[in-house]
């Protein structure tokens, strides 16, 4: 990404380092983000944290995209972004119900 996010779950290194510490995942530098198993584990953990913090999947997805601090600021200002979460959920439904 143009923001430096890496791997399947598009995690930024600073966020991933903090998540790795919380989950006791061995951090081996930024190359850790290119290990699909570790990247997905960290991304899933982070999304779960955002669901716990914001209370629903739509806000959690927006927090995952914008960052939790920025989303909180938006919400305090009365603005609730929805574009990213709509896009993710639309693609999830499309993929989820597609025959194999």
What is each stretch, according to the model?
Residues 1-100:
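Catalytic glycan-binding domains that act on GlcNAc-containing polysaccharides
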